[in-house]
Amino acid sequence: AVFATGARWTTTGYSPYRPERSNIPGCHLPIVMDIKTAIEVVLASPDGLGKNVIILDETGEYLPLGLAELLADSKIAVEIISPRSFIGADTQRTLDMPYVMPRLKNLNVRLSPLHFIEEIYEDSISVYDIWGGEPTYRTDVSAVIMAMTQNPNDALYSEVKEHVLAYKLGDMIAPRRIEAIIYEAEKLGRDI
Protein backbone atom coordinates (compact mmCIF):
# COMPACT_ATOMS: atom_id res chain seq x y z
CA ALA A 1 0.00 0.00 0.00
CA VAL A 2 1.25 3.48 -0.87
CA PHE A 3 0.18 6.27 1.46
CA ALA A 4 0.15 9.87 0.26
CA THR A 5 -2.10 11.46 2.86
CA GLY A 6 -0.47 14.87 2.81
CA ALA A 7 0.08 17.33 5.62
CA ARG A 8 -1.93 19.89 7.56
CA TRP A 9 -1.05 23.52 8.19
CA THR A 10 -0.18 24.50 11.75
CA THR A 11 -1.08 27.63 13.70
CA THR A 12 1.71 27.67 16.27
CA GLY A 13 3.81 30.20 14.43
CA TYR A 14 6.94 28.10 14.95
CA SER A 15 9.64 29.46 12.68
CA PRO A 16 13.29 28.74 11.90
CA TYR A 17 13.65 32.53 12.01
CA ARG A 18 12.87 32.29 15.74
CA PRO A 19 14.30 28.91 16.82
CA GLU A 20 14.37 29.91 20.49
CA ARG A 21 10.59 29.68 20.80
CA SER A 22 8.14 26.94 19.90
CA ASN A 23 5.27 29.28 19.09
CA ILE A 24 4.12 32.87 18.82
CA PRO A 25 2.54 33.96 22.11
CA GLY A 26 -1.21 34.19 21.53
CA CYS A 27 -1.25 31.64 18.69
CA HIS A 28 -4.12 29.77 20.37
CA LEU A 29 -6.49 32.75 20.38
CA PRO A 30 -9.71 32.50 18.32
CA ILE A 31 -8.52 35.05 15.73
CA VAL A 32 -5.68 32.71 14.62
CA MET A 33 -6.31 30.29 11.76
CA ASP A 34 -4.30 28.21 9.30
CA ILE A 35 -4.32 29.23 5.65
CA LYS A 36 -6.28 26.21 4.38
CA THR A 37 -9.11 26.87 6.82
CA ALA A 38 -9.01 30.59 6.02
CA ILE A 39 -9.42 29.92 2.30
CA GLU A 40 -12.38 27.64 2.99
CA VAL A 41 -14.00 30.36 5.13
CA VAL A 42 -13.46 33.05 2.48
CA LEU A 43 -14.79 30.88 -0.34
CA ALA A 44 -17.96 30.26 1.71
CA SER A 45 -18.29 33.90 2.80
CA PRO A 46 -15.94 36.60 1.42
CA ASP A 47 -16.15 38.65 4.64
CA GLY A 48 -16.00 35.61 6.94
CA LEU A 49 -12.63 36.63 8.38
CA GLY A 50 -13.71 40.15 9.28
CA LYS A 51 -12.54 43.50 7.97
CA ASN A 52 -8.82 43.57 8.87
CA VAL A 53 -6.78 40.44 8.12
CA ILE A 54 -3.09 39.78 8.73
CA ILE A 55 -1.38 36.94 6.83
CA LEU A 56 1.93 35.72 8.25
CA ASP A 57 3.71 34.02 5.36
CA GLU A 58 6.88 32.02 5.51
CA THR A 59 6.22 29.98 2.37
CA GLY A 60 6.98 32.62 -0.25
CA GLU A 61 4.46 30.80 -2.44
CA TYR A 62 1.27 31.76 -4.24
CA LEU A 63 -1.30 30.56 -1.69
CA PRO A 64 -1.02 33.51 0.75
CA LEU A 65 -1.02 35.95 -2.17
CA GLY A 66 -4.13 34.34 -3.63
CA LEU A 67 -5.91 34.60 -0.29
CA ALA A 68 -4.88 38.24 0.03
CA GLU A 69 -6.28 38.95 -3.44
CA LEU A 70 -9.59 37.23 -2.64
CA LEU A 71 -9.92 39.27 0.54
CA ALA A 72 -8.89 42.60 -0.98
CA ASP A 73 -11.33 42.06 -3.88
CA SER A 74 -14.04 42.04 -1.20
CA LYS A 75 -12.79 45.33 0.28
CA ILE A 76 -11.13 43.65 3.26
CA ALA A 77 -7.96 45.34 4.58
CA VAL A 78 -5.06 42.88 4.20
CA GLU A 79 -1.43 42.91 5.25
CA ILE A 80 1.06 40.17 4.41
CA ILE A 81 3.95 39.95 6.86
CA SER A 82 7.01 37.81 6.16
CA PRO A 83 10.50 37.46 7.62
CA ARG A 84 11.76 36.84 4.08
CA SER A 85 13.46 39.53 2.01
CA PHE A 86 10.38 40.00 -0.12
CA ILE A 87 6.81 38.79 -0.19
CA GLY A 88 5.97 35.96 -2.59
CA ALA A 89 9.58 35.11 -3.44
CA ASP A 90 8.60 31.82 -5.08
CA THR A 91 6.37 33.62 -7.59
CA GLN A 92 9.54 34.94 -9.18
CA ARG A 93 10.62 31.36 -9.94
CA THR A 94 7.19 30.45 -11.34
CA LEU A 95 7.02 33.69 -13.38
CA ASP A 96 3.80 34.77 -11.62
CA MET A 97 5.33 37.76 -9.84
CA PRO A 98 4.88 40.39 -12.59
CA TYR A 99 1.17 39.55 -12.71
CA VAL A 100 0.34 38.96 -9.05
CA MET A 101 2.21 41.79 -7.35
CA PRO A 102 0.69 44.64 -9.39
CA ARG A 103 -2.79 43.26 -8.66
CA LEU A 104 -2.04 43.19 -4.93
CA LYS A 105 -0.66 46.72 -4.99
CA ASN A 106 -3.70 47.97 -6.96
CA LEU A 107 -5.92 46.40 -4.29
CA ASN A 108 -3.92 48.21 -1.55
CA VAL A 109 -2.62 45.03 0.07
CA ARG A 110 0.07 46.09 2.53
CA LEU A 111 3.31 44.14 2.09
CA SER A 112 5.70 43.96 5.05
CA PRO A 113 8.79 41.89 4.24
CA LEU A 114 11.58 41.49 6.79
CA HIS A 115 9.05 41.66 9.63
CA PHE A 116 7.61 39.08 12.00
CA ILE A 117 4.83 38.86 14.56
CA GLU A 118 6.13 39.06 18.11
CA GLU A 119 2.82 38.46 19.87
CA ILE A 120 -0.88 38.06 19.10
CA TYR A 121 -3.53 39.64 21.33
CA GLU A 122 -7.34 39.42 21.25
CA ASP A 123 -7.68 42.01 18.48
CA SER A 124 -4.17 43.25 17.77
CA ILE A 125 -0.61 42.09 17.14
CA SER A 126 2.87 43.38 17.83
CA VAL A 127 5.24 43.30 14.86
CA TYR A 128 8.99 43.76 14.77
CA ASP A 129 11.49 44.48 12.04
CA ILE A 130 13.90 41.54 11.96
CA TRP A 131 16.84 43.97 11.87
CA GLY A 132 15.87 45.58 15.16
CA GLY A 133 14.06 48.53 16.64
CA GLU A 134 10.93 48.90 18.70
CA PRO A 135 7.87 46.79 17.88
CA THR A 136 4.91 48.38 16.14
CA TYR A 137 1.29 47.43 16.65
CA ARG A 138 -1.57 46.58 14.32
CA THR A 139 -4.94 47.18 15.97
CA ASP A 140 -8.52 46.15 15.18
CA VAL A 141 -7.22 42.87 13.73
CA SER A 142 -10.06 40.48 12.92
CA ALA A 143 -7.96 37.46 11.86
CA VAL A 144 -4.34 36.31 11.84
CA ILE A 145 -3.70 33.70 9.16
CA MET A 146 -0.67 31.41 9.46
CA ALA A 147 0.98 30.21 6.24
CA MET A 148 4.05 28.70 7.80
CA THR A 149 4.70 25.11 8.79
CA GLN A 150 2.87 21.86 8.14
CA ASN A 151 2.69 18.56 10.03
CA PRO A 152 2.46 15.25 8.16
CA ASN A 153 -0.85 13.35 8.16
CA ASP A 154 0.66 9.96 8.96
CA ALA A 155 -1.86 8.43 11.40
CA LEU A 156 -3.32 5.95 8.90
CA TYR A 157 0.14 4.83 7.81
CA SER A 158 1.15 4.32 11.46
CA GLU A 159 -1.95 2.17 12.06
CA VAL A 160 -1.39 -0.25 9.18
CA LYS A 161 2.37 -0.39 8.63
CA GLU A 162 2.72 -3.45 10.90
CA HIS A 163 0.09 -5.38 8.91
CA VAL A 164 0.90 -4.63 5.25
CA LEU A 165 3.88 -3.66 3.14
CA ALA A 166 3.48 0.12 3.32
CA TYR A 167 5.26 3.02 1.66
CA LYS A 168 5.05 6.73 2.46
CA LEU A 169 4.97 9.33 -0.27
CA GLY A 170 4.78 13.09 -0.54
CA ASP A 171 4.01 15.63 2.17
CA MET A 172 3.31 12.93 4.74
CA ILE A 173 7.07 12.32 4.82
CA ALA A 174 8.00 16.00 4.89
CA PRO A 175 6.09 18.91 3.34
CA ARG A 176 7.98 20.28 0.34
CA ARG A 177 7.66 21.44 -3.26
CA ILE A 178 5.56 19.47 -5.72
CA GLU A 179 8.54 18.86 -8.01
CA ALA A 180 10.28 16.84 -5.29
CA ILE A 181 7.14 14.81 -4.66
CA ILE A 182 6.67 14.00 -8.36
CA TYR A 183 10.28 12.81 -8.56
CA GLU A 184 9.87 10.74 -5.41
CA ALA A 185 6.60 9.20 -6.69
CA GLU A 186 8.16 8.14 -9.97
CA LYS A 187 11.17 6.67 -8.18
CA LEU A 188 8.92 4.74 -5.79
CA GLY A 189 6.81 3.46 -8.70
CA ARG A 190 9.89 2.21 -10.51
CA ASP A 191 11.30 0.61 -7.35
CA ILE A 192 8.07 -1.25 -6.62
Q: Could you describe each region identified by the protein language model?
A:
Residues 69, 73, 158, 187-190:
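Short, well-ordered alpha-helices that flank and scaffold nucleotide-derived cofactor binding pockets
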Residues 70, 82, 184:
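Acidic donor-binding helix in nucleotide-sugar-dependent glycosyltransferases
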Residues 10-74, 162-177:
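Glycine-rich dinucleotide-binding loop and its adjacent helix/turn
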Residues 180-192:
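An active-site-proximal "capping" alpha-helix that borders the catalytic cofactor pocket
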Residues 65, 93-94, 157, 178-182:
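Conserved strand-to-helix beginnings and helix N-cap segments that scaffold or border functional pockets
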Residues 20-21, 96-99, 184-187:
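Short, hinge-like loop/turn segments at secondary-structure boundaries
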Residues 34-37, 155-156, 184:
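Well-ordered alpha-helical segments embedded in enzymatic catalytic cores
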